[in-house]
Amino acid sequence: MKNVTIKSFSEEIKIPINKLIQKFADAGITKTNIDYVSLEEKKILLSYINSHHVNLPKNLSLQKKTKSKLNISSLNGKNKIVKIEVRKKKYLKCDSSLLFKDKIVKNNIDKTFCKKNIKDLNKTKKYVELSKNINEREINFEKKLIKEPILDKSKLKISKNLIKKNVKINKNLNIYKKNEFKQNLKKNKLNKKEKNKKIEINYKVKNKNENIFKKIKSNRLFGSETNFFNNNIDKKTNIRKKISSLTHTFNKPLKKIIKEITIGETISVFELSNKMAVKSHKVVSNMMKLGIKSSINEVIDQDIAQIIAEEMGHKVKLIKNNALEEEIIKNQNKNLYELKNRAPVVTIMGHVDHGKTSLLDYIRTTKVALKEKGGITQCIGAYYVKTKKGIITFIDTPGHAAFTEMRIRGSKITDIIVIVIAADDSIMPQTVEAINHAKIAKVPVIIAINKIDKITSNPEKVKKELIKHGIFLEEYGGDTQCLLISAKSGLGIDFLLDAILLQAEILELKAMHKGMASGTVIESRLEKGKGPVSTILIQEGRLHQGDVVLCGCEYGKIKAMQDSFKCKIKSVGPSIPVEILGLSGIPISGDKITVVKEEKKAREVAIYRQNKLRESKLRINKKIKIENVFSNLNLSTKKNINIVLKSDAHGSSQAISNALILLSNEEIKINIIYSGVGPITETDVALATSSNAIIIGFNVKPDFSNIKNTESIGLNIKCCSIIYEIVDFVKQKIYLSCNTKYNKKIIGILIVKNIFQLPKLGSIAGCIVKEGIVKKNSIAKILRNKSFVHESKIISLRRFKEDVNEVKSGTECGIVIKNFNDIKPLDIIEILELEELNKKI
């Protein structure tokens, strides 16, 4: 390519000469107005422009913030402070001509290179044409040789071979050049397309920016308030720029997907439909086909769920719901340690006021009986005593009839039962109950006849009565030990302890003293400042402070432990009662407690048990509702007394609720709508007000704030410390709520003589009193031909146009009967009076 002058080059790329010389100077080439520009210099200039090209911002924005506060008066009269922040933006647009000039220079240089490439292509075309002409000449020359006479055969062959070789070489060259030419053309086309696209995109973006800038300028005319909303415009434009096309990769399944469904012992219809990825109404319709009616939220059995899933073409895997529980039990390191002798667990049972707690006080050298309210034991207690011959654990049970469940619980966890019988009172109902509990539990019994130091005592009578109830003493050839004791003086108590230890030796009581502990909850309560406190009896292993335990529906890490003497301990072995702190809630008395390695597993099992308990309660309530639908329709007149019961311990609340339910009769039903452990709270008050219930507290006190609220509502709260008081209070409520029964008594007889009609009163019967008296507002029974016609109230009684309250026999009167005008002459009217009967509970 020939050298070009700077003037012609500047005209070609459309840039002033001065600026072009400056660009060359920046690139390191000194040029004047007269100098020429070579191809190499052009390349250097182009590379410099490409390397030093910087995208400058099109707009320069200056943001200004002004903050202020406004005092606004509200409806209440108080002033409100509102913070205001005004944001102003000012834009300075760069000269667009400068930005475009750089691009024009670049584009012009690219065009020159494109021209150069086109010239090169033209050259190659000429070269191809020349090669074609050469080939044609060679072919013509060959034809001439063939036409001429053959002089020398050898020369002719050589010339032919040479010609063939030349033709092949030329053909290969032509093919190679043609391919090269095609590739160059394609590349040029692609480059052109890409450049055109970029130019178009830049042009569109510029137009958009110019439009936005114009809008902002126009908004400035309306003042600074409009600038507050400019941020939103900028955000919207940015969002529009970032829009990208999304393509989903989901393919609709052509075949039915067969799933493997895990089904537990119970599953709801909604859960089953989710597992099968089917709409729940389809599952319900399939169940209807099988003749099973159910709703979406209803829980179905494992067998029904399996049949439905298999019918819908899915595989079923049956699992046990208590699989995790079984795994926890397996993980316990049982049978790894040696069995050693343990202390016997002795439960003391008997009738009320027969001296059970007094006996324990003498053994333990304490005064528990004096501190007990009402002089009776109302909660189960566990203590261990160190004697000269060994340790004995005693469980004290209440003797009242209401505490049957506590006695059953005591008989289940015990090794020996000591039945205390008062020598002056003989065998009573709870004594018989204790004997029956011992027989059911198959536990050996020791009879302790107490109060032998009294003058009225008769131990022989007690011994004879025991035979009637199947207890055969050693004196009469049986195997039951009988001892005469006095809890006050201590007479015979040492012999009783010896008898207990002897019986323990015969039983050969053994347990593991190491490993993961397990036991039973004797009692649980809620204490202020401590939270849930549980009294447990360890039966196996060793319990340490910090162990994770699972107890029924509750779990937790043991924070602290204390023995029956209120001393803090770090660990405890078998047959020793202990109080523990740290459970998540109050466990149910009688629940099994086990040590678990992982807290996560303990929590999972506890949640599963809670859900199972909730489901079972819902099922029971549903059955009760269905069974009582028709009975409630017939017995709509039956009254309900709703009670909210709160007690200090779980066992006490259970016993009291059972005792109160037994007070229900034909007219009144006792409903324990809620029973819990702990003080009376605001939620209890809210529940009682909504259900019109009585709040009963046993050994608990309500908050004073709640009492103030209840006074205004008129809510009834009764706090007692003795079970007798609660029973008497509820009995009184039943007596007051009972419907009074009346007996109808005939006090007078009338005979209708004449009928008068008045527009206001209706039919007036003119009668004569044959017997007795007639009273106003009394009931009139109308008989016609000795058959009943109507019975209603007398609303008006007159004698000679005067209103009177009563009329005696032998006199005439006029009466008006309520809602009855079909009175006829010679009708007989009986006057009735209601007589109240005595109430009975």
From Swiss-Prot:
Domain spans labelled tr-type G: 341-508
Region span, G2: 375-379
GO molecular function, one term: translation initiation factor activity
Keywords: Cytoplasm, GTP-binding, Initiation factor, Nucleotide-binding, Protein biosynthesis
SUPFAM superfamilies attached to this UniProt entry: Initiation factor IF2/eIF5b, domain 3, P-loop containing nucleoside triphosphate hydrolases, Putative DNA-binding domain, Translation proteins
Region of interest called G4, as start-end residue ranges on this chain: 450-453
S-S pairs: none
Binding site for GTP: 350-357, 396-400, 450-453
Coiled-coil residue spans: none
Localisation: Cytoplasm
Principal place of residence: cytoplasm
Stretch list, region G1: 350-357
Top-level taxon of origin: Bacteria
Location of the region described as G3 in the Swiss-Prot/TrEMBL record: 396-399
A cellular-component GO term for this protein: cytosol
Chain positions covered by the region annotation G5: 486-488
Transmembrane regions listed in the UniProt entry: none
InterPro entries: DNA-bd_dom_put_sf (IPR009061), EF-G-like_DII (IPR053905), IF2_assoc_dom_bac (IPR013575), IF2_II (IPR044145), IF2_N (IPR006847), P-loop_NTPase (IPR027417), Small_GTP-bd (IPR005225), T_Tr_GTP-bd_dom (IPR000795)
Family note: Belongs to the TRAFAC class translation factor GTPase superfamily. Classic translation factor GTPase family. IF-2 subfamily.
Function: One of the essential components for the initiation of protein synthesis. Protects formylmethionyl-tRNA from spontaneous hydrolysis and promotes its binding to the 30S ribosomal subunits. Also involved in the hydrolysis of GTP during the formation of the 70S ribosomal complex.
Protein name: Translation initiation factor IF-2
Lineage: Bacteria, Pseudomonadati, Pseudomonadota, Gammaproteobacteria, Enterobacterales
